[in-house]
Amino acid sequence: MCRTLTKVLLKRDFGLEWDMPDSHLVPGLTGRINYLNWINEVLSLLPSQEGKTCNSGSVAITEATTRRTIVNGIDIGTGASCIYPLLGHSLYSWKFMATDIDIESIESARKIVSMNHLEDSIQIVQRTPEQPLLEGVVKEGVDFCMCNPPFFSSAEEVDMNMISER
């Protein structure tokens, strides 16, 4: 039910097509949107192209961010849902480079980006655990970098992850 609700809300509120493998956890939208709004607020406190800052009211914050020419973000560990790049682009027209180490997540994220014709705005990059996080990935200026801790569906999955990292 949560998967269906997320799919319907993304379509209704953001015009996004979305689907992902059943084997992955479904992201809650409210917390993700709040995180992106917080990043937008932080960006608004930085000098704009005109050297001004803005730090009051959500409308002014949005205006401050839109004064920046292009906002580029990196989502480390984007997951199968690619939710932050999708919402960040929909809400603020940000461009994203999204990375992950899981091939199923990469394939799912690429499919979602393609379904929404966002290849010019969201780039999906596969990494390996051995590679440095950002080396060779960042090719132009980056305004922010974001990540979340891994999400697990059960205590057993947490235990398995701990064992595999040793």
Regions found by a protein language model. Give the residues of each.
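Conserved SAM-dependent methyltransferase scaffold
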Residues: 82-85
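N-terminal pre-P-loop "Q-motif" helix
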Residues: 31-35
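S-adenosylmethionine
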Residues: 92-94, 101-166
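Phosphate/ATP-binding catalytic cores across multiple sugar-kinase/actin-like superfamilies
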Residues: 37-42
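N-terminal auxiliary segments of SAM/dcSAM-dependent transferases
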Residues: 1-28
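Caspase-like (clan CD) cysteine peptidase catalytic core
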Residues: 88
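Charge-biased, low-complexity intrinsically disordered regions
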Residues: 4, 25, 43, 61-63, ...
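Conserved class I S-adenosyl-L-methionine
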Residues: 53-80, 95-97
